Regions:
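Active-site-adjacent alpha/beta core region of enzyme catalytic domains
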Residues: 10, 84-211, 320, 325-340, ...
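Patatin-like phospholipase
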Residues: 2-103, 134-145, 150-158, 216-217, ...
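Short boundary motifs at domain starts and secondary-structure transition points
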Residues: 1-4, 111-113
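Short acidic/His/Gly/Ser-rich catalytic and metal-binding motifs that mark active-site loops
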Residues: 76-77, 131-132, 211-212, 343-348
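Short amphipathic alpha-helical segments that mediate assembly, nucleic-acid/protein binding
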Residues: 106, 213, 233, 255-256, ...
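General structural feature for long, well-ordered alpha-helical segments within catalytic domains
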Residues: 23, 60, 64, 95, ...
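Acidic, Ser/Thr-rich peripheral helices and adjacent loops at domain boundaries
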Residues: 216-287
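C-terminal helical/tail subdomains of lipid-metabolizing enzymes
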Residues: 270-413
């Protein structure tokens, strides 16, 4: 592959919808201006992170910014007519056609990524009909741009971003795939398990949600009220009133809202567990290194002088050959930027109204840039720390938590 830079850093991008991809663009723009960027060899992304990562891997952040600034809600998920909803989902998936017109179709995107120096790794959820009881199936789909056929890779990126609460899944070769956030919203583990990765820079979108909007239920009830003498309409009006009462108590007004809430729970939980696993593993690595140093030093000091070199070699070999379910010969500095949309957040429900103002999009990009800049300033020695040497103090942001611990490992997929 072209280029002479040593590429030993991974970038990890979480899912996050329209707000997440704008924040991630700002984060990536700041990384590109830093000493981190020439060393980036891999981008691991899910959903919004897959889209941002696809453009970043090609060094097309300017094109991504132009694309996002011109993007309307209906360019991503086109609302469907009421009579279509029961069988076809709430929206049509318009993003593939929009991207084909403005950026390139799936095959073109995959071909460009195959030739890029930076490898993109994206994640989707397998929702194929599996009728056999396979206890080892984890439903995670992993696609790597340097080994996946271009057309497949392009469709995998689109599948990763197909929000399940809004649209039907996408076929990728012989698999039915959808939003990767269900199984791997923040793919830290995969980056850590890559033996060539020496450091990780990541962005995690912290979602916030607006109160449920039941105005459409009220409007429907008001329109139907004049037909309340008709028995079926009267029964429907009673159900609509019950839905409004449930909403007033903070309960899901209707079944689709329950599914949306469960989706949020699943995504938030797998993200939190990903970081927790990362922190636990890195703590184990650092403690094992400390224990190894103390045991070897104590044993060698107590041995006869002539025996010390051989004993040290034997003990080092013993520790090195130990089998653990994670790499224990190194720790990986991991800088994580976390971002919320704040007051400039766009409506993530992809309704056509209100529109997405350009000034708020620019504010989100700037917010992501600023958050990255602040984190890099707090960790000015991020790339100069010795990997695998000593212990990190609680004030050093080298791990899954800003302010203290290092990153995780790649699940078998």
């Amino acid at each position: 592959m072209p280029g002479t830079a040593i590429r030993d850093i991974a970038v990890v991008l979480s899912g996050g919808g329209i707000n997440g991809v704008l924040l991630e663009l700002g984060f990536l723009k700041r990384l590109r201006e830093s000493p981190v960027w020439p060393r980036v060899g891999w981008i691991y992304g899910t959903s919004a992170g897959a889209l941002a990562g696809a453009m970043a891997a090609q060094d097309r952040l300017g094109d991504l910014e132009g694309f996002l600034l011109s993007l309307r809600a209906e360019d991503v998920f086109q609302p469907r007519r009421l009579w279509q909803l029961p069988l076809g989902g709430l929206h049509d998936y318009a993003l593939p056609e929009t991207m084909a017109e403005r950026i390139g179709d799936a095959a073109e995107l995959g071909s460009a990524l195959a030739a890029a120096e930076i490898e993109l790794v994206v994640f989707a959820t397998d929702v194929s009909e599996h009728v056999d009881g396979d206890g080892s199936r984890h439903f995670e789909l992993v696609y790597r741009s340097h080994t996946t056929p271009p057309d497949t890779m392009g469709r995998a990126i689109l599948a990763s971003a197909a929000v399940s609460a809004l649209v039907l899944p996408v076929r990728v070769d012989d698999v039915i795939a959808t939003d990767g956030s269900w199984v791997r919203n923040f793919p830290l583990e995969h980056a850590y398990r890559n033996p060539d990765v020496r450091a990780i820079a990541a962005f995690r979108y912290l979602a916030s949600y607006r109160p449920s909007d039941v105005a459409f239920v009220q409007r429907m009830r008001e329109r139907l009220d004049r037909f309340r003498a008709v028995p079926p309409v009267r029964a429907l009006l009673a159900e609509l009133r019950l839905a409004e009462e449930r909403a007033g108590r903070g309960e899901p007004a209707h079944y689709p809202e329950l599914i949306v809430r469960l989706m949020r729970v699943a995504i938030a939980r797998n993200t939190v567990l990903e970081e927790r696993l990362a922190a636990d593993r890195e703590t184990s690595v650092l403690e094992l290194q400390r224990l190894r140093e103390e045991i070897v030093t104590a044993a060698v000091d107590a041995a006869p002088r002539r025996r010390r070199p051989a004993l040290r070699a034997e003990l080092d070999e013993l520790f090195a050959s130990a089998r653990f379910p994670f790499r224990h010969d190194r720790h990986v500095p991991c800088l994580i930027v976390r971002g919320t949309p704040g007051e400039d957040g766009l409506d993530p429900s992809f309704r056509a109204e209100p529109p997405w103002p350009e000034e708020r999009k620019r504010a989100l990009i700037e917010r992501g840039y600023r958050l990255a800049d602040e984190e890099l300033a707090r960790n000015a020695d991020f790339l100069t720390r010795e990997v695998g040497k000593g212990r990190q103090g609680p004030g050093q942001a080298v791990g899954p938590r800003a302010g203290g611990r290092s990153g995780p490992g790649e699940a078998g997929a």
